[in-house]
Design a protein with these regions (language model features):
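Active-site neighborhood of divalent metal-dependent phosphoester/pyrophosphate hydrolases
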Residues: 4-32
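An N-terminally biased module of ancient metal coordination in phosphate/nucleic-acid-related enzymes
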Residues: 1
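FAD-dependent flavoprotein oxygenase/oxidase catalytic domain
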Residues: 28-33, 37, 43
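Active-site regions of metal-assisted phosphoester/phosphodiester hydrolases
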Residues: 23, 33, 46-47, 51-245
């Protein structure tokens, strides 16, 4: 599972004791605060006697008080995790700062969590961020061209219905859209209307969130979850569940 804008409040204490389940730091300075979203989820999963490996990294300051970050939870043992900038801006106080989080597992697959900027942003556009991401993945041999079994997941801020922009760029780089490959699928809509960043027009619904695969897999189903129909609404973006053989 990949989570974006997985936040903690900057003024909360840092956890000093051991973290639940299998915590994998994404760098030498990795730490979490007591109200960290990923930490709360890890504690809940542990209470349900589930076993997961998890990692988290902070990326930027949101709304003046939240450290908005990225998280990955894996049922497969994670052997290592790291995070890296994909934006030209690297200022924690600038809300346009963007990072990626990567987790590699013991038996091969790598999982990546990202929160991309907008295609037409004059300061931090999608194309530049995607190019930096691809460069970092090339160094780690995690691109489709590297033969990697990678899964690239997150909020891409790129409506699937718009041609010639973010989604098409990712496709051109060799990634496969699991929604399109799915044998069973729903509408795919992950944002039902206007939210922050998309208030310049009326939007009846957009598919902004994706699970991309580096290799061709048999995708049995792609389903929108946490949308009030399949699970409660938890965010202004719904979740995406892919069943992959």
């Amino acid at each position: 599972a990949a989570i974006q804008e997985c936040s903690e409040e900057e003024d909360r204490p840092v956890v000093s004791g051991p973290l639940p389940m299998h915590w994998v730091p994404a760098g030498p300075d990795s730490r979490v605060r007591e109200d960290n979203c990923a930490l709360v989820l890890a504690e809940e999963l542990q209470g349900l006697q589930q076993e997961y490996w998890w990692t988290w990294t902070g990326a930027k300051l949101g709304y003046g008080k939240y450290n908005e970050g990225l998280a990955i939870f894996s049922r497969r043992p994670v052997t290592g995790a790291d995070s890296f900038y994909i934006s030209g801006v690297r200022d924690f106080s600038n809300w346009k700062t963007r990072k990626a989080l990567a987790a590699c597992t013991a038996d091969g697959p790598a999982f990546l969590s990202v929160h991309m900027g907008w295609w037409n942003d004059p300061e931090e556009n999608f194309r530049g961020q995607m190019e930096r991401l691809q460069k970092a993945l090339r160094e780690r041999k995690l691109r489709p061209q590297d033969g990697s079994d990678s899964f690239l997941m997150g909020d891409f801020n790129s409506p699937a219905a718009i041609r010639g922009e973010g989604r098409d760029m990712v496709l051109d780089l060799g990634w496969r859209d699991s929604y399109e490959d799915a044998e069973i699928k729903d509408s795919g809509i992950t944002v039902p209307g206007n939210i922050d960043g998309w208030r310049d027009g009326e939007h009846t619904g957009m598919r902004l969130d994706y699970i991309w695969t580096a290799k061709r897999h048999r995708v049995l189903q792609s389903k929108v979850v946490l949308n009030g129909i399949s699970g409660p609404v938890l965010s202004d973006h719904f979740g995406v569940l892919a069943v992959i053989e």
